[in-house]
Amino acid sequence: MSAIENFDAHTPMMQQYLKLKAQHPEILLFYRMGDFYELFYDDAKRASQLLDISLTKRGASAGEPIPMAGIPYHAVENYLAKLVNQGESVAICEQIGDPATSKGPVERKVVRIVTPGTISDEALLQERQDNLLAAIWQDSKGFGYATLDISSGRFRLSEPADRETMAAELQRTNPAELLYAEDFAEMSLIEGRRGLRRRPLWEFEIDTARQQLNLQFGTRDLVGFGVENAPRGLCAAGCLLQYAKDTQRTTLPHIRSITMEREQDSIIMDAATRRNLEITQNLAGGAENTLASVLDCTVTPMGSRMLKRWLHMPVRDTRVLLERQQTIGALQDFTAELQPVLRQVGDLERILARLALRTARPRDLARMRHAFQQLPELRALLENVDSAPVQALREKMGEFAELRDLLERAIIDTPPVLVRDGGVIAPGYNEELDEWRALADGATDYLERLEVRERERTGLDTLKVGFNAVHGYYIQISRGQSHLAPINYMRRQTLKNAERYIIPELKEYEDKVLTSKGKALALEKQLYEELFDLLLPHLEALQQSASALAELDVLVNLAERAYTLNYTCPTFIDKPGIRITEGRHPVVEQVLNEPFIANPLNLSPQRRMLIITGPNMGGKSTYMRQTALIALMAYIGSYVPAQKVEIGPIDRIFTRVGAADDLASGRSTFMVEMTETANILHNATEYSLVLMDEIGRGTSTYDGLSLAWACAENLANKIKALTLFATHYFELTQLPEKMEGVANVHLDALEHGDTIAFMHSVQDGAASKSYGLAVAALAGVPKEVIKRARQKLRELESISPNAAATQVDGTQMSLLSVQEETSPAVEALENLDPDSLTPRQALEWIYRLKSLV
């Protein structure tokens, strides 16, 4: 029989627990018991495994021992962080009644629910990384997707048209928690993600969503936000907002608007492209040697998060980009002065979110005060910068002198962690609080005077006055003198070597002091809450200030990076094309122990595809990736690693660079490669930048060559995309002779005997050879194997190309031949009976077959 089924047999306390647990059946319940949060039954068993804490038993209820695990209340944030990182959610149940006046169990209620996507506590968040709650919806027309960063109030929605676009959005946003409808069809799209939450269908209803959003924003409709005609996105947004309200158990005043993200506003990059370019995460899953690791020297966490958003959403509006470029140029002479001051601002964005949720701690308000104290100096420095965008940021960040003065008067210089610890409100801020504190703090002087007086009166030199939390104030006399205690001394506690007493005067003073301490703490909590009421009316202006400070941090950082790393300002042109003089890979040049070899690039409508040949390890992939990264950097407004760059409009960046088996989906390397290739061929346009590396590996030589040829042909002739096409199929170097707009380039290398020197220099024309055996020798392949390979190579080169292909590929089954149409000549031969032909008919058939070939 379960605990719920046997409800009436439980103790009153366990009945209270079971009622609360029934309201939150799928998540852990932290049930406050004095100085501990305790978990019972299955929750206790799960928590003991997840947190590696002891599983014990707490007496019995309904005749059965109760499995129990517990954690100290003062260490709860550490344990919550561990659970949230594992995708768990936790309901926090606090005592809200007074134990002294309660009959039966103290009243308790769930005051907040901590989930991976709705955390705002500083201890639970990665400070330089967005923490998103997301919701996904699907109908016959496509997907709806919404994200909310509850730690900043940033609310976005979009309507991805297909599965590939939706997958790219999931990878870009990487939500900590994802809500989906109970009938969601594309489960393979989200399976394996952390923080999945299945929600009932009614939470995604469009009418409910509109009502929820209008209520949140205080509007009659959503036209002003530009989302009125995005029903799928609104369905996701409505579910997401309801979930956020349910978990926070309070209003969300910092969520003031919602923004529609449209494909045409930014350069689109699919999941494979983001992965291959290693923008914020390398191929091994870490953050080292990524584009962000080179560009991100921001001095505030909110600036770092903004920069990463820019990197994942390059904008196409050249007006925005030119404004950023101009600002970066104007700030280059001021970075050394601005960055130390900006560093002192801290993470104002997340502090404001905690203020809005009324969970800001005393040190949050102290940090907010410190941020306000930097604003006058920042504004004074920016006044000297000759840039309209900088002056606009200066105005937007404001000064908040009144709020700074309020916090300077209200909060002590170094407050404790929690308001319940007391001593947060500064002396002089409130007269009544000062009076209660004086009464409580005067206890030390009183006790010293009492001790001197009683020693003199009794003549007992071992007499002393003290206090402990259990027994309160006492007079202590050694065991040897205890028989001399006056008659008015009432025994309170017996120790091994002493007796402790109380007298009416001391008891009366104890009551007075404890009352004053309690009243002081209660008043302090009230004054602290009133500070929220004084600050919250300024929330919108404060959020604008935080946004301006974060943007300033990003732009100052990019100015510093441009100067330090010798970057140049790219020029935007109207027609498709990319012209780079002495371009460099932004990441590789930082990790090399030798100078990076800069290379040029020229793509235009008249030269829209480069066939790139050269040895493995020669630098083909680096050359291709650096082109994409330079384009990406240009389209966030950054300066770029080159001597000169001219770049035209780009709508998408595609990369088909390297692949690995997708074992989880049952897809081979070749299948992954072909899926990514298909996506490119279906979605690329003449404004797209396409990187194709070694297409056609993983199948027979002829199949691979045929596929690579056809893909290159399609990209150059039909799609007309700007394409870098690296290959080891030397037959493809004939394409420039057969098609307009195609050119050969190669990565140079020098071979001397058994050694090879990679020049990493891009030259016009095709490579003379692939240097495969030299690279194999460099990799440590045994010499006898290299020797045998050279012998076999000479054999293959001495026979006809067809024979060579037969020897190499004879045992391989051609994928393309399976569905090839039979030629007319073959069909004619299959229907021919040679035994029935006359010599003349046989001759006629020879001529007929020749005409069919």
From Swiss-Prot:
Provide the binding site for ATP.
614-621
Species this chain originates from: Escherichia coli O7:K1 (strain IAI39 / ExPEC)
Its Gene Ontology cellular component terms are: cytosol
What's the family?
Belongs to the DNA mismatch repair MutS family.
Which protein is depicted? DNA mismatch repair protein MutS
Q: What is the lineage of its organism?
A: Bacteria, Pseudomonadati, Pseudomonadota, Gammaproteobacteria, Enterobacterales
Q: Does the keyword DNA-binding apply?
A: yes
Which GO terms label this protein's molecular function in UniProt?
Answer: ATP binding; ATP-dependent DNA damage sensor activity; damaged DNA binding; mismatched DNA binding
Question: PANTHER family in the record, alphabetically?
Answer: DNA MISMATCH REPAIR PROTEIN MSH1, MITOCHONDRIAL, DNA MISMATCH REPAIR PROTEIN MUTS FAMILY MEMBER
**Record's Pfam families?**
MutS_I, MutS_II, MutS_III, MutS_IV, MutS_V
Q: Which GO terms describe its biological process?
A: mismatch repair
User: What keywords sit in the KW lines?
Assistant: ATP-binding, DNA damage, DNA repair, DNA-binding, Nucleotide-binding
State its role.
This protein is involved in the repair of mismatches in DNA. It is possible that it carries out the mismatch recognition step. This protein has a weak ATPase activity.
